Amino acid sequence: RRSLPDEEKPPRYVGLTPLEQGRLKVRRQDDWIWTRRLERYEPMAQSVYNGPVPKSLNARKMRMPENIPDSPIAQTSILMGGALEAPGDAVRPGVLSALGLATSNDPAEPYLITNESSGRRLALAKWIAHPKNPLTARSIVNRVWQRHFGKPLAGNPNNFGVKGKKPTHPKLLDWLAADFVENGWQFKRLHKQIMLSETYRQATEHPQIEKLRNLDPDNHLLAYRLPRRLTAEELRDGMLVSTGELNRHVGGLPVMPEINMEVALQPRMIQFSLAPAYQPSVFPKQRNRRTLYAYRVRGQPDPFLELFNQPNPNDSCEERVAESVTPQAFSLLNSNLMNDRATALALRSEKEFKDLRMQVKRVLQLVFGRVPEKNEWDRLENYVEKMRKYHLKHEPEKTSYPTSITRSLVEE
């Protein structure tokens, strides 16, 4: 049917009503989605394919062709005006000549790599990770610094070219990059080196703060430590650590954490049909893994993480924003996620201690990392007793979850 002209293709769905046609499309889509999900449990070789460009007619997992055709490598051309219909001169694969790091000893073509089907990726990887490559180590060190201090040494982590911002401390960036390479590209050593430095361990206050704000308002000179707000992932993981729910297991398949119920049940289109509703992982041990392992649906972001500036997965984010908006406060006070974490924290403190005073102390230790002061202790104990009496008179409503949902699709 694919090979026939449109006017000669036989009609589809003969004898089916529009309702039956819609159900058939949804069922086919479900079959495709669940096949993809089941494939995640199959062993997979982390390898690359060298050969002519294979023809793929679907979005399922690519497999090695049984018979690799003996055809030439696809030619890459300069597109005149950016148009696919106007190919210009053919070009060969190569590396950035501006960095001055050659890939071959041929003086005529020092920056080109092989044009054969095998060896191109390896040649590029060796060039990127070459100790004399001036870009790779600096880019890595710049991002690690940004992770610890909230802002990078060079202002555009995604752009180390002439249009990017110049580093505020170029000699420091060069020294860290050189030391990183000389010591075997050890990330653990780099993190330790930064975190044990006097700059990292500075106080957030300065005796001449007003003078510094006039001379260096953005603290480019690093005269004092600027506090960094937790990222969305760190915030969620930190709450799970405090409540004792965090599953610290390393590796494995992505998990489906709990998200807002209304968002989870919203109809979502995928490949011209309805996608299955979002379903959290069955067991708490699965749901409460680190956010690093959370499965991200591009068309259905987690509203809590999105509210706290988790980047859009469709974009390349070089530096996160740290906006403070009113819905963040409401979410931290009234969201289902926070209510569940508060309940889990209370249950943990009751399990560890029977005495109310020790329970209050334990909660503050877990959340703030310190013991309560005298006035805090009294206020918190009085508040807990007040809430206990209130809840004895007013039982909380039982939470009920839908066991089935109905979603309709309108053909236009």
Spans of features found by a protein language model:
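Glycine-rich phosphate-binding loop at the start of an alpha helix
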Residues: 323
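Active-site Gly/Thr loop motif
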Residues: 290, 300-308
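Primarily short, surface-exposed interaction patches in extracytoplasmic proteins
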Residues: 1-286, 311, 315-320, 333, ...
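Active-site-proximal helix/loop microenvironment
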Residues: 291, 332
